Amino acid sequence: MAGSLVQTEAGVLQSVDAVEITMNLHSRIGGVPENIQIKLNGRNVRITLERRGCENGELWLLLPALSTVSSRGEWHAFADAMDERCQLVSFDWAGFGDSERPAIAYDANVLRDLLAGILQHLQSADQVKVNIVAAGHSVPIALGLAEQCSSQWAQIVVVAPTFRGPLPTMTGRAGQSFSWVRRLVELPLVGPLLYRLNTSRPILKLMLRRHVWVNRNLLTPERLREQQRISRQPGARFASVAFVTGGLDAASDSQWWLTQIQKLHCPAHVVLANEAPPRSKREMLTLADKADRVSDIDGRLGLHEEFGTLLAQTIVAS
């Protein structure tokens, strides 16, 4: 019966529905997935988290880039290249991937609370420091916790960092200017229709080719189907439209993250995407000026996925 409770092996009471969801989870980075509950906007939201590697090894938390096709699976090649003596952890942001996708007001504060909850969940009794690796638009979410949490970080690596969503980047206008687009896509009937048009395979292919991947051979029909599957899951339109319209932006100008990076209590490593769109590349360079270490890879905004092996080698190189 829906809503009935069962006792798991760990002795935790869960609803039958929750147990079924956990059993149906798939590995995305070659590890073991699990579901946890984190309170966001006054309600518990189911977040899917995955661990890979040695339980007692050096801890690495991998933050997926925020995008219409955001998924922890972006880190699979990176995870394959890392030493198995490390413990790698990644998760799907609320509203994306395998995590719950409720119709809530998504913004940078919600995702910052989510990341703080993940860090608290991972905190061990011996206070082992965590290596943060943040990709793309997840970077300002992590930097938003610089003052609060970074004393517990061994380092933060920011990969092809961005701080503005696509529409604010293209137009130069703040995210508030596009709140009407968010309201439109959130409507019943018309909202799903508009979102479906925006996640057609030709649109996704254009976006991935121009901004995300360098190698066009990656844009196979099978891979495009998988990207479309991620983007069209029930409830996915709410967080996705927030991202596209700048609703997830932590700030409207680069001065904010220049201030935040100076609040860090750990080293910062910026990995530049050499083939990023010009405006995004300029903003990456301003952040790199404040970093302790700078590297560059000939990729675009999805370099952590396309060049995961090279990225892993670059990060661990002394």
Language-model features and meaning:
Residues 287-318:
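Catalytic active-site module of serine/aspartate enzymes centered on a nucleophile-bearing elbow/loop
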Residues 90-137, 163:
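Active-site loop/oxyanion-hole signature of alpha/beta-hydrolase fold enzymes
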Residues 201-256:
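Alpha/beta-hydrolase
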